[in-house]
Structure formats: structure tokens, C-alpha cells
Amino acid sequence: VFLKIMLAQKERRKLKFFRLFEELPNGEYTVKKISELLSYSYTSTQKILNEMEAEFQDFFQEDFSLLTELGTVQLVPTNLNYDTYYNYLIHRSIPYRAIICSLTEPDKDLLSFCKENFLSRASAMRQLQALADYVQEFDLLFNRSQLTFKGDERLIRITLFNFIWAASRGTEKSLNVLAKQPIDEALLFLQHEIPLLQDYVGRREIHLFAEIMYQRIRQGYYVVDDTRYEEAKFSENQRVKTTLVEHLAIPPEHLDAEFHFIQFMMFYAPTFQFPEDVRIAQMPSFSGHGQVLMPLLYKLDNYWAAEILPGDTSFPDNKVVHGNLFNVLFCYYIFPKRIPTLFLLMSYFRRKQTTCYKYLKGKYSVFLKKMSRRKDLQWLTTCYEDLADLFAWLTLDIFEEHQFREKLQVALVMESNYLFSQEIKGFLKDLSFIELIPFSPEHLPKTDFLITSSAMLIPEENHLPYVVFNFFDGETNYEKLYANLKRNYRKKCYANMAHNTDESQTS
């Protein structure tokens, strides 16, 4: 999602070209060969290579030429890597420059922006359309003609933070108005409430958010307060409020709302990493009279033991997972329609939806939909699917760890010669999910997988999966063996999971 918003199709193709350059063996390649490897036409390949050649001059000046005098392509030197080129394209992109412009030059309209970036108004409008469409999902409006955002100020700041952080990781030079030291001083007294301040990357995140906050306040945009923040019992530290007024120029009438929103941002993402996090000890206090989120989590504990992992009562002991579940719930409690998160901009998770993930998401959907019928939880109606998705990812590891305790039973069907078996036994010993057992045709029902030196050694009645390691022709592909073992291990675990689920439903 992030790349499709930030980069035009041609720029995304350039990244594919660069990735190919990193994978190819050293040497020179014809334009035709590159076009064939990427399945692009010769003409479009030539055009993209010419543009990349011009861009690389920003890195190499006259020291390197992508296209040789003979018209061949030589690979990029190793001192320019994919990540550097990726960041280069992102920072040059029109959507990213428009976002930065909206913060640092609020008086600049689209025509001035186009003149500065040497592009037509029509081209700019077209390149900014994906950004406008994306923010509209959260009831925000991005006015492309004025380069301004309208809507809930809290969601605007979160959206700006997401894009700028994903693009710059806090290194955007134009957002360095505030000296870092005053920000640290202003937030020093919130060290317990904001553990991110004790983390190297966390401090960068906070500094970036403070810069965005400062720029928006400077333009006259303020957040509104929200009584629902009481679910997390925010601090009212007057000393911190005073330093915020001094360093961020917050008018007194907006101070409480801005201070509360700063604290909300500590719950904006699943930021719990360690059981020692001081906020974990505070969580039981969130279940007082009138509060709904912690009681909902307690109900989830019971549901886990009854429906998700029948009989497992250890789920409440995982404080880090519970802290992150609370954070996610809290975000959607405040913004039930949908909240823009970095998670939604990532494509990584969309490609790794395992059977366990789908099982968990289905279970959470049933639970949250049922809970949404209660009067104090009707806000779940609009967001239970999003929550089920996040809950599934947050609990996937502990669920799989529990499911995958049983090992894959592997037997060797090969000559009784230690020279044959010692290497493969050593390989299997390093795999934590494998248990090597003696082979016997009578024990086939207790065996999951066979490794043999010849298919001729496999018993006729065998129905188990197997791999042949023929030592005489050198067919000993350990990578292929590992992938095969892992695939069968997961298949066994999923079968056990389905069996246990059926048993719990019939009992």
C-alpha cells in the first residue's frame, strides 16, 4: 500500500530493476536480456535504464555509468544498495514532497508546488490521487489544490506521522525545527508513562511526532479532548504541562487536550516489548467501575481457554501480549470506524497468512461480533473485523508455539553404514521440530516422514511422504529437504489443530 501511494508505476519498476541487479552474478548484460528477465518490452526497459542512469549520477558523479558505450548494462557498485536507492526514490516522490510541504510551507498551493517541482498541474493531481483516496478511508480530506488536510486533527497527525516515519525514519531535515534537547526535557517526567523514551528508535519516533505536533499547532490546528481516554487513566502531571507550554507553544485552553493526546500516542501501536514494562503493572487499575476494555480482555481469556485452545489457562500469563491487545482495543475504542496505522501500510503481513492465522482470525471475529451486541460494546460493530485481524497477528506466535510442540517423527531408510548416515543425522539434529526415530515397517503408523537412499527401499505398503538422498549421484539437496520437512511438519500441526477443534466442539 505504501509504495503504491508514494511511487508511480515507473518508479516501482525501477526498484524491480535494482533488485534484479543485486541478484545477478557480476558481469555485463544486454538490454534485451534484462527485458527478458523482467518480462518488459525492450523499449520500456531501455527508457527505465536511461532514467536510472541519470539518477545514479547523484550517487557516483562521473565514476560509474550504468550503460556502457557498447550499449550493455553493467551492475551497480555494491556501495549503492537497494535500501539507499529505495529511500532516494521515496524522498523524490511527489506525494512525499506534498506531505512535507503541507507541514513546513502551509501557504504554498498546488500551482507553486508544481512550479518548484517542474511538473504540470494535471500530472501532480494524478500522482496525488492515491494519497487522497487512502486518507478518505479514515474520513479525512486531502485537498490536492491547496495541499491541505481536513478532518479529525488527531487522525491527520497520525497519518502524517505514518507516512513521514515510513519514508524517513525520523531523518527528514526540514522537520528539525525543535532542538532535540528541549523535547527530551519536556517529556523527561513522562519516562514511566512513555517507555519509548528509553529506546534509541523510540526517541526518534517521539521527536518526529513532536515536530509534526509543533508544525500543526503553529498553523492553528488543535486536537479535541476525549472522555474515553479515561480507560487508560492518563497522567495529569502539571510540571510536564508547563514544559509543553514552554517548548511547543500550546495555548492554555488547548493544553489538556494536547497533553492527553500525547499520552494516547503511547497506545497507538502495540508497543509492549518486555514483561518489565512499567505500564503492565498499571493495567489492573484499568478495570474499575465504568471501564469496558479490561473486562473485555478478561472475557477473551475465558474464550481462549474454552474455544481457541481448549483447556489452556496460561494465556493470561503472557503480559506482553495482553498489553498489546489492550493497546489495539484502546485505539479502536477511540476511533471505532478505523484508525490509520503503519500496519495498514505494510504489504509484508498480507503475504504471510498461514492456516493458523486464518483459524485465529475466524475465532476472534466470532467472539468480537458476539460482544458487539452488548450495549456498552456496540462500538465493536464497525471494527471487529479489523480487530480480529490484529488480534490474530498478535497472538499467532504463542498459538503456534502451543500447537507445534509435537515433533515430526522422521525415520531413515538407508544402508547400515555410518558413513552414509552421519551427515544427515547431524543435519536433522539441528532441527528443533524433528525427532529421529528407528525405522520399522511395523511402526509406520507412528512415523510421519521417511528419508531414504533409494525409492527401491521403501516398503510397498508405505503411504508416507519421503525424500530420496541418492549418495551415488550426489542428489543431496539439504535446502530442498528442509523445505519438505517444514511443509510436512506444518501439515501435521494443522491436522492436529483441526482434530482438537472438532473434539472441543463435540464435547
Regions found by a protein language model. Name each.
Residues 2-507:
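A cross-family "folded-core" feature that marks the main globular domain of proteins
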